[in-house]
Curated annotation (Swiss-Prot):
It comes from Yersinia pestis. This is UPF0283 membrane protein YPO2347/y1985/YP_2134. It holds the Pfam family DUF697. It is a multi-pass membrane protein. The chain crosses the membrane at residues 71-91, 101-121, 214-234. Keywords: Cell inner membrane, Cell membrane, Membrane, Transmembrane, Transmembrane helix. The lineage of its organism: Bacteria, Pseudomonadati, Pseudomonadota, Gammaproteobacteria, Enterobacterales. It comes from the Bacteria. It is found in: Cell inner membrane.
Length: 353
């Protein structure tokens, strides 16, 4: 038996129709736009953060243009021209009057002024090379995303000359043998970063390990805090000078102060989060105090500070940005320091007993 029909249902509001998706118009990419296109990678977020820090450091490197600076420069130029004109007049008068004492004093003063001007020019040139290294990293960063051809090889050969690598260097020969005419600028720079640049980076890493170990051992065995502070400061400055020399940067007085200040500035911008990320949580999971003395723990801290200064000095002196997996980590230096201290301190204890 069939079921009775249901009554009709009247809806007060009309049924809502589904919204059709709005499609964007087609967009065609030409060859010029395709060369500038590169896919986005989420793993590059950390590198973007470091790039912002690098931008802040580069801004600190570049001199600030201001009206007062221009006025002071113009005043110094006018004063220098006046001193030169007055010196010429004094020399002329002393020569005519045969005043040999005044002539000798004027000549000596002129030589001192020339020596001072030469020192200023030399310091400016060294500061310029330090600023130029930051510009070279920007150029390298642009070439690493470029699909062009021709500029990468010229740029890398310039870096090799600045580093003092001759044509017979094994790393440079391997790089030249690996090049092919089909390689673009990005591939050429990547090959240079993987084959040639490690020859300098390994030397810098060895210097950092040696200086960090010396600082850690000095703090661990020395009972005088003032001597420790002076020793650490002296060794850190020596380390920065050594790393700069390895990468072909000649430091003067002001450029050395500028580089040391930029290293500290870079560390301040990086913050403590990078230290925790690189060292890891094994500081909390392992009972360090049970295995090493308090002085040894202080030595490890001083050694890590030296290693951190060295790593930041490498970043500022390298002509190329870090590629993935190339940047040295504090955890590697920490393990080396702990092994050296564990092998050294027990020997000292045995000899004392």
């Amino acid at each position: 038996m069939s079921e009775p029909l249901k009554p009709r249902i009247d809806f007060e509001q009309p049924l809502q129709s589904l919204d059709e998706p709005v499609l964007k118009s087609a967009q065609a990419f030409d060859e010029q736009a395709a060369e500038k296109f590169y896919p986005a990678a989420p793993e590059l977020d950390a590198e973007d953060e470091e790039g912002r820090v690098e931008g802040l450091v580069n801004a600190a490197l570049k001199p600030k243009r201001s009206l007062w600076r221009k006025m002071v420069t113009a005043g110094m130029v006018i004063l220098g021209a006046s001193v030169i004109a007055q010196s010429v007049q004094w020399v002329n008068q002393a020569w005519q009057q045969q005043d040999w004492i005044a002539l000798g004093a004027t000549t000596a003063g002129g030589l001192i002024i020339l020596a001072g001007v030469g020192s200023v020019v030399t310091e400016w040139r060294r500061l310029y090379h330090l600023r130029q290294r930051a510009e070279e990293r920007d150029i390298a960063r642009a070439l690493l995303v470029s699909h062009g051809v021709g500029q990468g090889r010229v740029f890398c050969e310039k870096l090799a000359r600045q580093a003092g690598l001759d044509q017979g260097h094994p790393a440079l020969q391997r790089w030249q043998a690996s090049l092919h005419e089909t390689h673009n600028d990005r591939e050429v720079v990547e090959l240079y970063a993987k084959l040639v640049q490690p020859a300098l980076d390994n030397q810098a890493r060895a210097e950092i390990s040696r200086y960090a170990a010396e600082s850690a051992l000095m703090i661990a065995v020395s009972p005088l805090a003032l001597v420790d502070m002076a020793f650490i400061a002296w060794r850190n400055i020596r380390l920065i000078n050594r790393i700069a020399a390895l990468y072909g940067i000649e430091l003067g007085y002001f450029s050395r102060i500028r580089l040391f200040r930029l290293v500290l500035l870079n560390i301040a911008f990086a913050g403590a989060s990078e230290l925790v990320r690189e060292v890891g949580m094994d500081w909390l999971s392992q009972d360090l105090a049970a295995r090493l003395s308090a002085r040894a723990a202080q030595g490890i801290g001083a050694g890590l500070l030296t290693a951190r200064l060295g790593i930041k000095a490498m970043e500022l002196c390298r002509p190329l940005p870090w590629l993935e997996g190339d940047k040295p980590k504090l955890g590697d230096f920490r393990r080396q320091l702990m092994n050296q201290l564990k092998n050294t301190l027990p020997k000292k204890d045995k000899t004392a007993h």
